[in-house]
Swiss-Prot record:
EC number(s) recorded for this UniProt protein: 2.1.1.-
GO cellular component assignments: cytoplasm
Protein name: EEF1A lysine methyltransferase 1
Main location: cytoplasm
Lineage start: Eukaryota, Metazoa, Chordata, Craniata, Vertebrata
Protein's organism: Gallus gallus
Amino acid sequence: MDDDDDDIPQLSSHTLAALQEFYLEQQQREGMKTSQGFNQYSVGSIEEDWQLSQFWYSDETASCLANEAIVAAGKGGRIACVSAPSVYQKLREQGGADFSVCILEYDRRFSVYGEEFIFYDYNNPLNLPEHLLPHSFDIVVADPPYLSEECLQKTAETIKYLTKGKILLCTGAIMEEQAAKHLGVKICKFIPKHSRNLANEFRCYVNYASGLD
């Protein structure tokens, strides 16, 4: 038997360091869950699944978007988070009885949030439960999972069905023209950040006078 290990693929030192950092972060999060009591609504309580193109917002960005949604919805308003689970989590973490919120999401891990979770596949944009009536939400916050016009166009069908008018869209800067085309939204000065740096520049878009400029 040949004992030569030359043919075994070796990870680079940079990749090994990144993996070690990732596993250390996981261990630290698990430790926090057990030692401090687990907050199921904290951003990151459900791990990102990169295969589903999941990248959570930073805590600061999630708070900013949640607060914007609350103000835009108004007292007693209804907020829909479409493929934007970290905004939903921040809304629920902050609490408050002056609004209601639901999460439309493909990832069934978020079903832990009970009746507020609605399974959603952008490929079937209008395949929604009967109780989700058209134009029944004061604002829709959406973050389409992929930077493609097809994904944006289909998600836009859902957004336009749900919203009474107000839209807060988060997607790549490269989607500015398509966002205006399909949803009539304009880019904001506010720049959203993610907990892990992404290669693509992200921006927010709205169709109303927001606090993000």
